[in-house]
Amino acid sequence: MESRNRIFGAAAKEFAAKGFAGANMDRIARAARLNKAMIYYHFAGKTALYRAILSDMFGAVRAAVTAVASSDRPPDEKIRDYVAAIAREAEARPHFPPIWLREIAEGGTHVDEATLVYLRDVLGALGGIIAEGARTGRFQPLPPFMVQAGIIAPLMVFFATSRLREKIARLTRADVAALSRADVIAHIQRVTLAQLEGKI
């Protein structure tokens, strides 16, 4: 199991840095300090390894947001919890934001049906929260995908751009490097709720 975890960790970093097309199995083996045959012992190939990483990412998100949606908290608190849950899973996996941003840019080229099921369930959890809020008259019945896009985009960009923000900060007076996780999450929570409540 240790060798599998080492492969998984090395591959996650490689895919985050190079994308699926640019990722190299020899580099993954070297980073994991294993021979390449060991990769193929645990995973059928590059595609299977990549999809295992996607499954870990989106399986964790699905579990987290499903728990949020099924809680007995009011809809507005569920939205706050939903945003925080996705942020928590993304932060726990530094490879998650760059991999997902790249997949979005490439039209989900390497997303398989199992991953699509995870995505469907995540949207379903959000849709359930929105519907609950709409029934009470608190929320507008907005399309879950539109709301999700407004959550995912800023979260992924924030977590994926720490080095870029440091470079920008050196050239401008904007202290973008000092943006905190808590500030960004709170902003996304406020904007999402304002959108659902018809205030913007």
Where in the sequence are the language-model features?
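Short secondary-structure transition hinges
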Residues: 48, 63, 87-131, 145-146, ...
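Short, structured helix-loop boundary elements
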Residues: 4-5, 25, 47, 51, ...
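Amphipathic alpha-helical linker/stalk segments
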Residues: 9, 53-81, 120, 129
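C-terminal peripheral helix-coil segments that are non-catalytic and often amphipathic
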Residues: 85-88, 92, 120-140, 153-200
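Helix-turn-helix
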Residues: 6, 10, 14-48, 52
